[in-house]
Amino acid sequence: MIMVKGGTTEWPDAGLPGIRINPQSLMPQIVNDEVLAEALAASTDPGDLILLRLVEGHAAEAAELLADARYKDPDSLRLRIFEADVLRVSNRFDRAVEVFRQLLAETQGTLEEAAVRQHLGRSYFAGGNVGAAVESFAKALDLRVAGSADAALIYASAVALQRARDVLEQHS
């Protein structure tokens, strides 16, 4: 595993101890191997190992784990989001966006909509569609604030929105 040292305490949480969202790339990154190993050892959630494989860039391994997990829990939104993330990690950005749009149609008006919009924004950003990323992150932030979401989620959306706006401004 690759570990980033120092200066990551301000990075948004990625949902698994030892992994945080890099505020430049807006992608999850391992920041502490020991904390991550402890979290994985204590976890019974198959999604945690899938997330790790995605962070490591092992899309094929993540897809295999995901197929098994989806068989056991076909309706899990988190696992369906990971399906699109497998596509993103495989550099199939258009297809990842398409899957996220389908999930967005299903989650519109629910508490999960903000999470889907946040992930959609990351796929847009990774694929170079920064304008669409700004829109998606802004909507995710608005929904999270309006819904009194956890402060860590609001922070993650704010960081992503600011980064996307900065990149958009640099390229204008």
State where each predicted segment sits.
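TPR/TPR-like (Sel1-like) alpha-helical repeat modules
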Residues: 130-148, 155, 159-162
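Alpha-helical adaptor scaffolds
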Residues: 47-56, 67-115, 119, 129
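Structural signature of alpha-solenoid helical repeat junctions
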Residues: 41, 75, 112, 152-156
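N-terminal alpha-helical interaction modules that lie
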Residues: 1-73, 89, 167-172
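Alpha-helical junction/boundary sensor with strong preference for TPR arrays
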Residues: 73, 107-108, 144-147, 168
